[in-house]
Amino acid sequence: MKITAAVARSAQSDFTIEDLELEEPRDNEVLVKIVGVGICHSDISARDGQIPTELPVVLGHEGAGIVERVGAAVTTVKPGDHVVISFATCGDCAPCHNDQKNYCEAFPALNMLGIRLDGSKALNKGDEIISSHFFGQSSFANYALTYESNVVKVRSDAPLEILGPLGCGIQTGAGTFMRAFKCEAGSAVAVAGGGAVGLSGVLGAVVQGCHPIIVLEPHSE
């Protein structure tokens, strides 16, 4: 199908808006019409060669939208469902089975290389192959092809245009205090940096009952 996407073609350069061809969903894949997407520093790092993603590539990994079509083996979502897209995991390794999917043994291959596990890519522009499946989604586009394993269904009245960062930045910050540190109520915490990830960490600390919560920000003077 024809889509419009922001393509990263070289390091330190602007993204270009281009018309591309996107494959139909495979058995375990979900086609999502993107409503909103965040931009993360990891997208810039991939464009600039700090993450080993082959250029040209469609980046974007904080997508949210509406399911358009699903592959034959998909059972957890259906067309019309509202979803947030997070990182991809294999579901078969020990960390995945132990509810530690962020430590998935296939994480680099599934998320950072711009390919499926079989080495294929889902995007092209004529004879030119474009890297896809960045963090299992490549959501800097009006449509993204993702995996069933990394879409999370949300309420139909949830504001999709602002939910995308739940897939990366917000869970990174909040998860630090709620899952990694498992802070107990009354714990004193300090957060260095009051950006999106830092403030999400503050919210996670509030949920855990931490006190005091201190945010450190550089001062221009």
Name each region found by the language model.
Residues 7-14:
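Extracellular beta-rich ligand/substrate-recognition surface
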Residues 2-4:
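Extreme N-terminal starter segment of soluble prokaryotic enzymes
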Residues 87-149:
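Cysteine-cluster motifs in flexible loop/terminal segments that predominantly coordinate metals
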Residues 21-22, 54-60, 132-136, 142-143:
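Short Gly/Pro-enriched turn/cap motifs at secondary-structure boundaries
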Residues 23-37, 47-97, 110, 153-157:
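Glycine-rich beta-strand-centered segment in the early N-terminal region that forms part
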Residues 142-143, 149-151, 155-221:
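Mid-domain Rossmann-like dinucleotide-binding core that forms the NAD(H)/NADP(H) cofactor-binding site
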